[in-house]
């Protein structure tokens, strides 16, 4: 289903809610990130500056909408992980994607990040998260634990732009939930 509301504006308003930034600054950031997602070449240095200068003021409680609790495979201690399904929902006004499209998004993000010096030699860690899995043959869902790439708040600005770019390129694969 096609969406006309794919943008990071609402997500940024929620993330910066309660911060000292005026609406016009948040709107400027949203326009900048939307423009980056729509451009043929992403300026990762610009995104690094935005991350360093603006994203550091996001409050702990505002991260809850895009993070899930996870665990390293060899450790019982909980940590936070930014989740694609939550980003997709926020960026597409409640939309979602099938598992195969989320896997393609993950590959798109990793490949794109690997071109940026900050991530060139990064070893991507996997973490375990609890999720619901739907068995299409039996038409039931069940609790499951899966391995996903561990993305943190430090990766957020890149994840927003790259997820948005992927959604803009693949609007037909977005499932309308409401």
From Swiss-Prot:
Recorded family membership: Belongs to the mimivirus L114/R131 family.
Official protein name in the record: Uncharacterized protein R131
Species assigned in the record: Acanthamoeba polyphaga mimivirus (APMV)
